[in-house]
């Protein structure tokens, strides 16, 4: 199953939220799932992707070009899709996944899931 995960790119969140992201990244492998996410290499996104990558999960990063240009992309992803904007990112993540999970985050995470 392709699982879309929405989570924070901020480094200013509670440490246990980083652990939750790492745990989910590892558990995706146990279930034989793939990860579709926002493509970031920082915050919960980075923790999620790093753990998933270490566990052998196939990763699809969907990230706006303006974040990629700031070197915020998790480059170890199996597939990196650059979008023009956040709206296109949300649309593609929805289309490329079978289900969605939201981890704790701020207003950016909330905006992506509504």
What are these regions (language model features)?
Residues 1-96, 113:
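A cross-family phosphate/adenosyl-ligand binding-site feature
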